[in-house]
Every structure is written in structure tokens, then in C-alpha cells.
């Protein structure tokens, strides 16, 4: 369970079957993916369509990274409160 706390499934795929079988990514992997996308978004020769696709990808990575942070914070709070079940 502890490992699951810090990993999410990769960003949703168009095909739902692929999303279920996708390997999990860590918070750091989501942040790294987000950084790569931001670098690509800074390309002045990027088309509008490609920019929008990259923006969607960035938002998915950000959402998943935020979920991991929320999960970690929730677990932290449970550990700080000994009266509650962890």
C-alpha cells in the first residue's frame, strides 16, 4: 500500500484497456514529464494544434502529480494523529 501512495497510473489513454494496463508513475516521473512538455511548449515554431495537445498532456501530468501530493499529505496527517487508524 505504501508504494501505491506515491504512484499513479500514467495519464489516461484514449483506449480504456491500455489505461488499465499502464505502468504506474511516481511523483517525480510526473514532474519530469511536465518539465519536458513545458520545454516543448516554449518552442516558437510549435503549431497551435501541437501546442494544445501538449497543453492537455501537461494538465494531465499536473493533475496526477497533485493527486499524489494530496495522497501523501493525507497519509502524513494520519501518521501525525495517533488516535486515527492509518
From Swiss-Prot:
The keyword Phosphoprotein does not apply. It is found in: Cytoplasm. It catalyses: Exonucleolytic cleavage in either 5'- to 3'- or 3'- to 5'-direction to yield nucleoside 5'-phosphates. Its EC number is 3.1.11.6. Keywords: Cytoplasm, Exonuclease, Hydrolase, Nuclease. InterPro entries: Exonuc_VII_S, Exonuc_VII_ssu_sf. Gene3D superfamilies: Exonuclease VII, small subunit. Residues 1-26 are annotated as: Disordered. GO terms for molecular function: exodeoxyribonuclease VII activity. Pfam families: Exonuc_VII_S. SUPFAM superfamilies: XseB-like (SSF116842). Its main location: cytoplasm. Disulfide bonds: none annotated. GO terms for biological process: DNA catabolic process. GO terms for cellular component: cytoplasm; exodeoxyribonuclease VII complex. Heterooligomer composed of large and small subunits. HAMAP family: Exonuc_7_S. Bidirectionally degrades single-stranded DNA into large acid-insoluble oligonucleotides, which are then degraded further into small acid-soluble oligonucleotides. Belongs to the XseB family. This is Exodeoxyribonuclease 7 small subunit. It comes from Helicobacter pylori (strain J99 / ATCC 700824) (Campylobacter pylori J99). The gene is xseB.
